[in-house]
Amino acid sequence: TRSAFQVGGSGSNTRGVFGGGDPGPSSSDVIDYITLASNGDAIDFGNLSAAGRCTAGASSQTRALFLGVNAQNVIDFIEIQTLGNAVDFGDIDNGQSGSKGYATSSPTRYIYYSGLTIGNSNIQFGTIASKGNTATFGETNGQFRRKNCASNSIRAIFAGGYVSPDGSESLQKDNIDFITIASEGNAVDFGKLSVARSRIDMTANQRTCLMAGGQSPTTLNIIEFVTIATAGNAQDFGDLTIARSQGTATSDSHGGLGGY
């Protein structure tokens, strides 16, 4: 219902939901939804507990989480089929800021990585059906900022990011890593992007993970993909209509929610 960037998105196999973001001149608390099978504009769903950009989204078939609300450690949730305002779910633990984080999920577990803290490599997780705080899952394969993620029901893929020893974004990375969602542990090398970049928009179905746009540091329009079950480098998929970054993405079968 509004133009914004740094929105948190997720959904079920019928609805996509999007919360927060920055429409300018200030952050938003609006939650919108779309029906994935039907083209059309987003419709108002409700509101987050506070306005904020850089909110991360994850979901099961019935419940959607918004992590890092108002750039804090707050986690909100909604029931996807029931319009209304978000309710408190718990907190992001381990002293992590919620700002500029990224999330993904299987049908049962959500995964969260804080993309703001310099030197952070900690991955957090929780159970979508059970309210409460996150717990430590493991470490990413390097201390990167703005490293996004997507998943099927088995594996989560992390891609890109940048190293920021001096606060600049000059050291863009081309790393792709993965974790097995059901088993806590550190991320393992998967392959490489064709272009080193950060702020990538990512989504997946059971087979394929898409990685679109990003900054290198200029904004890009490329779309790449990997086959989630097979480690290897990203391959060309196509192009966005315009160069984009800092958006969000979902699908009707992300996180293993569908059978594609």
Where is each model-derived feature located?
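Polar, enzyme-active/binding microenvironments
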Residues: 1-260
